[in-house]
Amino acid sequence: MEIQSNFSLKNYNTFGIEAKAKQFIAVHSVEELKTILKENKNEKKFILGGGSNMLLTKDIDALVIHIDLKGKEIIKEDDDFVWVESQAGETWHDFVLWTIDNNFGGLENMSLIPGNVGTTPVQNIGAYGTEIKDTFVSCNAINIETQETKTFTNAECNFGYRESIFKNEVKDQFIITSVIYKLTKRNHKINTSYGDILAELAKNNISEPTLKDVSNAVIAIRQSKLPDPKELGNSGSFFKNPILLKSDFEQIHKKFPEMKFYEVSETEVKVPAGWLIEQAGFKGKRFGDAGVHKNQALVLVNYGNATGQEILNVSKEVQKTVFETFGIKIEAEVNVI
């Protein structure tokens, strides 16, 4: 295990932003992780996973610990369900494909989401009607201060829309090392409630979709709308879809009757942030090397040599204009560093 100094993080964040780490080390086992934490107790630390949900606006004046724990295994099963444990450093999409290849259901709608397994509970990632909380059983984590292992159950994670205990009450206190999911072995609950998925399946004349069919449909949709970070730096959806009280939404809807929305409860509706941003005139707009993607207004992109600050400035301009136009605040889903 070698600590490197003045280390470039350009290849460790999907925006492809050039930023330096004061110190950097990759860890490949829980034992290595505990040792590094113990030996560097008084150093400032920054924990790095897949780098897919962050915007680096400056160099990191800390010891960057890259979690590169690999491996996955079935830890329990019965006739109907299987409990699978994945190490935190596994690439999420590869893990999803592995579950589908084994005919384990529950994650297929979240195919092609960038990032690693370890960050999935932090954000409670989700797509096309499913979220991590639907299949999440528990995760194992190391206390940064004491190096003790703690298991967080689903209930203890306080999951909300792109929220969890790891973004709030215990933020920066734990490092997730593995995650356990409970998946179906039969009687899969195929979720094709989103119109895009139904349209993609219909295009391929599929009326009774398998897990693989749904995954392929989601992959096709995402590839048509979202740029590949290897070709164009981005972090997927930069903004959360705002959730409004119905009473507030009704007032706004009177002014903008064409506004799209989805009911999330008896008292709340979700408005697509991408629609708001597009209507505000930002879709495809470019500011130097930073901009809003031409096919999906939720996505901010680095066209080459944008700095994190330049991308942040674009996001602030988008937020300001959307609020001035619609009276709706949109929040960043990405962690700004």
Swiss-Prot record:
One of its GO terms (cellular component) is cytosol. One of its GO terms (biological process) is regulation of cell shape. It comes from the Bacteria. Its EC number is 1.3.1.98. InterPro entries: FAD-bd_PCMH, FAD-bd_PCMH-like_sf, FAD-bd_PCMH_sub1, FAD-bd_PCMH_sub2, MurB, MurB_C, MurB_C_sf, Oxid_FAD_bind_N. Its cofactor is FAD. GO terms for molecular function: FAD binding; UDP-N-acetylmuramate dehydrogenase activity. The keyword Disulfide bond does not apply. The active site is at 162, 237 (proton donor), 333. Keywords: Cell cycle, Cell division, Cell shape, Cell wall biogenesis/degradation, Cytoplasm, FAD, Flavoprotein, NADP, Oxidoreductase, Peptidoglycan synthesis. Cell wall formation. Belongs to the MurB family. HAMAP family: MurB (MF_00037). This is UDP-N-acetylenolpyruvoylglucosamine reductase. It comes from Flavobacterium johnsoniae (strain ATCC 17061 / DSM 2064 / JCM 8514 / BCRC 14874 / CCUG 350202 / NBRC 14942 / NCIMB 11054 / UW101). The gene is murB.
